Design a protein with these regions (language model features):
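Conserved catalytic or regulatory cores that recognize and/or transform ribose-phosphate-containing ligands
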Residues: 1-137
Length: 137
């Protein structure tokens, strides 16, 4: 994305990590989190999405992420373009995608084969690139 001349800024939620001093240093992924951490993390994500012109999602087909699906829906509800970059570590399996994502996104760039296209994709106009070769659920 940094090499793409049509990209001015990238918001990556993991660069906006929140810490709650009351939690201590050993909080791990999937552990119960404080209300402060949950509220601040959620609001930072919503703020980033609200200020974005479009969204690009690296979408792990092997371990689906409800948060990504929510964020994609949030952007589409605001009529903002969404580019999904699906990838898998199991290329031998027939890929399947949920209908609401496969028809809701503006463009698909297959992460396993087309990742280099992110360098030249026109994010100013976000041309449509329909998903092909996937089953639908």
């Amino acid at each position: 994305m940094a090499a793409n001349p049509t990209v001015e800024h990238v918001h990556f939620p993991f660069d906006q990590q929140v810490t709650d001093p009351a939690e201590g240093p050993n909080v791990g992924f999937g552990d119960e989190r404080s209300l402060l951490w949950k509220q601040q993390t959620y609001q930072n994500d919503i703020n980033g999405l609200s200020m974005a012109n479009c969204g690009v999602f690296l979408y792990d087909m092997d371990e689906l992420d409800d948060g990504c699906a929510f964020e994609i829906g949030f952007l589409r509800a605001q009529n903002k373009p969404v580019i999904i970059v699906p990838f898998t570590n199991q290329p031998e399996k027939k890929p399947i995608m949920n209908l609401m994502l496969s028809e809701g996104a503006t463009a698909f760039i297959k992460g396993d084969q087309e990742l280099e296209l992110l360098k030249t994709y026109d994010f100013n106009n976000c041309p449509c690139r329909p998903l092909t070769g996937y089953g639908t659920i």
